[in-house]
Curated annotation (Swiss-Prot):
This is Maturase K. Pfam families: Intron_maturas2, MatK_N. InterPro entries: Domain_X, Maturase_MatK, Maturase_MatK_N. It comes from Calocedrus decurrens (California incense-cedar). It is found in: Plastid, Chloroplast. GO terms for molecular function: RNA binding. The keyword Phosphoprotein does not apply. HAMAP family: MatK (MF_01390). Belongs to the intron maturase 2 family. MatK subfamily. One of its GO terms (cellular component) is chloroplast. The gene is matK. GO terms for biological process: mRNA processing; RNA splicing; tRNA processing.
Amino acid sequence: MDEFQRNSNKHRSWQQFFLYPLFFREDLYAIAHDHHLHRSGSSEPTEILVSNFVSFLTVKRSIRRIRKQNNSISLFGNSDSNKFIEYNKNFSFKSILEGFTIVLEVSFAMRSKHFIKGMDGWNSLRSIHCIFPFMEDKLPHSNYISDIRVPYSIHPEILVRIFRRWILDAPSLHLLRLILHECSFSRENLQKAMITQRENTRFSLFLWNSYVYECESFLIPLIKRFFNSQSLLYGSFPDRTHFEKKIKDIVLFPLQKISTKKIWLLKDSFIHYVRYGERSLIALKGTHLQVKKCRYHLFHFLQYYFHLWFQPYRICSLELSKTSFSFLGFFMHVKMRPLVVRAKMLDDLFITDLITNELNSTAPLKSILFSLAKEKFCDISGWPISKLSWTSLSDDDILDRFDRIWINLFHYYSGSINQDGLYHIKYILLISCAKTLACKHKSTIRVVREQLGSELFTKSFSKERESISSSFSKTRSQRERIWNSEISQITPLASFWQKMENKQIEN
């Protein structure tokens, strides 16, 4: 893959304008074949190769058959092998689609690099680890937030039009249109393919990333330009001559009556943009009228430019000081925090009261209990029950699974302000683990505790707690929080809570 990308860099113009010949190179499908085997984790690839319809030789024969035909539509038409059309059951079509995606991904990566270099004034962080510290640092300085939910349902022709802006190869666009229309990627099925399909994740993710990339490439500069044009307010610094001339034209009262205590400040509005999946947050520092106009322009821009009908709930504006919002499994709200500052100058002592804003993130305990009840760790009321499906495992595996669940939850919600409520979740998992072991050995919880003692789930937790707090206890205050983010823990939980929030909103 790296060698193919290096070779394509030498012939960038050829790759952008003539992608269609690359789709018939057999080495690309060999790369896709190896990628599919590594992704599926198959330890016996020979069983796949001997199948009649899941053979890599079938892919090579299909490529040669396409070369001899004048019309590529027969590839997806009503041929003798009807199973070839069923992409979710046909390994040949998956390999062809993987090779098709590889060619598009390389060209898309080159285009995205030029776009990032052209975004002057924007500092982008492309890691999920930066989301929560970034929001904790930037949101307290904002007063409004716009919550945008981009719909999954996309018309195939919109995707074709997006690719047509940076690929001028007509046969490639025809092939893409053919795949989108004939392979269950219609407007009704594209949402299902992107959300639930596990067979063809790479192509679906590429379509989704291309669509979101196109939205952001137009949306973010548009919002920035709008707020920069609305940010300068006349009436600031009335002691200056050039400002006084402008004030005379717009102010209806004499300048002599302007009190020095009511001098306006010249501030530039700023915005911050955060996105995870189809959920986007835009933090704004401006007036209510500016936010209302921004929502109006966002709605019409996405509706007319991408031909999408946005329901009213998909774009909502909230005032951070009055309401809270949920994002990636956290309930967040901005709260004012008074501070008393004492300044001593010679013999005088001055006491000043300052009010600052801070972002408080709360763990949704009820949602966590509902998820545990759904996975049969407890009942609806929160009473722990045994995990019967794990009784066939060994004792070490059972302890390790329960321990891993708690450690992941503890790390994910390490920055929440209600960590004391998480210990109730720990109690449920602890008793559920003991009941599972008791059910396996056909004994009681008391016998299990006597046999395992301190090794029952709490030993590993104490080590993790000490490793987290000991290194920061000397440098941090009691009000500061630690965001302990690990890629193996935060990504699955963030995706899980994102799906839960989407289901609640749609229902």
